[in-house]
Amino acid sequence: MNRIRQCLILTMVMVIGLSARLAAADDAAQKLYDRVTPSLVVVQYVWQNELGRNELAGAGIVVSDDGLIATSLGLFSTQIPDEQMKDFKILIPRANGEPDELKATFEGRDERTNLAFLKAAEPRKDKKAWTPLKFEDVPAAIGDKVTSIGMLPKLVAYKTYYMESIVAATLRGDVPQVLVGEGLAAASSPVFNADGKAIGMVAVSQAQALLINKPEALVSIQAPPKLYVPASDFLLSFSDPPKAGHPLKLPWLGIPEMTGVAKAVADDLGLGDQPAIQVGDVIEDTPAAKAGLKQGDIIVKVNGQPLERGDQAQDLPGIFRRRMLRFKPGEKVTLSVLRDKGQPLTDIAVVLGEQPPQSDTAARFWADDMGFGVRDMVLIDNYVRKLEKDQKGVIVTVLRKSSAAESAGLHQEDLITQLNGQPVTDEGEFAKDYKAFRDQKPHEAVVLVVQRDGQETTVRIEPPQ
């Protein structure tokens, strides 16, 4: 009888202890939820392109006390020209009623970390101070508990919600990621360790909805994401964020094609387990070419440090590119390369240039009457199309469905080299000559000579009747 009584007492003690721990855990979760919720907002803007208007919105995190908001670069794709993004807003959810709307400025994209930034352009309507969230570089071990707090879609009033999981694995592709077992809150949500420190951000995945103002955002609740990016990968953005009117100047090497060296090849070259990448091509007159880097060179070290290992050889070029993005234009970087099997490494000092203009910043023109748009060529166009570096023309960017241009057989990505028998130099000249011709001869066809897949063809666009 005494033994039974002792067992009952022991069981009661264990139950009481477990209940206390569960209560403490519940209390900690509620405190974290209450602390983090004011740091979560909605960022919203209008993408006004040639074909119409689309309102985009996603989750944002307050990262400074002056209203600087971080969000995923995926929401502000580099394929969207800056001039087409308008009406930026920050929405602050309220427990009851519609969210407060604040005008905002777009500070810019940060391709180094895959983040974008906005800042409030007017005071908060509720008169409250901003509550920035501080991220810390704290690694998580297998089996560690992690939590995330995200924002539900517009359909459920942007309410915040809490998720718990366990670290299952660490992955190293182009971007370092941590895999969890159960699931996390929606893309761009902050991730916390057991001490309540913000240690990462939920990764954006092709399978997960990024736009929280669309019905498909519910997918993130029904099938929660399981990957997050550790803070070590993006803290740079918070200490050196882009600023409105002053986009970040990114470094430029001029090596568009690289291949990760497979283990068997590395062994044959005597590199053993050392990660390496092989240069596939070097663009003429770029920093890499001027420094003497050659096709076939095998890069083994950067500034004396071995390349970072990826889970697969194919991950190495992406890892290398992201590492190079951490430097600044004008900095000197020493690349140690292997040129001949069994020979010592050759050190090549490269003074990094500034990344040339990209397609999203190229000047554009929209021929509304014929239903097509064009932009200036950029350096990468010449490289991808294997054109001479002095090739002139404009690139077709968009076609309106059932337009005169589409009906005539014009294709997106066509390179227009002639307009009505005259050479096309750039967007400015094309726009001027096109508008002049349409004003003077509105009933005559527009005749374009285009290059497509290495072949030249003529497209005759009859004016709409």
Regions found by a protein language model. Give the residues of each.
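Catalytic-histidine neighborhood of serine endopeptidases
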Residues: S64-T113, E122-P123, V204-A209, P215-A217, ...
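Active-site region of chymotrypsin-like
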Residues: V36-R53, A121-P132, Y158-P224, G272-G280, ...
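PDZ domains, with a preference for the canonical peptide-binding region formed by the helix
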Residues: P81-M85, K301-T334, L419-V447
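Flexible, gly/ser-rich surface segments that form the specificity/activation loops bordering the active-site cleft
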Residues: A28, L32, T78-P81, A129-V178, ...
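Catalytic histidine site
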Residues: V41-Q44, N49-E83, S189-F192, M201-V204, ...
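N-terminal activation segment of mature serine protease catalytic domains
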Residues: A23-S72, R112-A116, A141, V146, ...
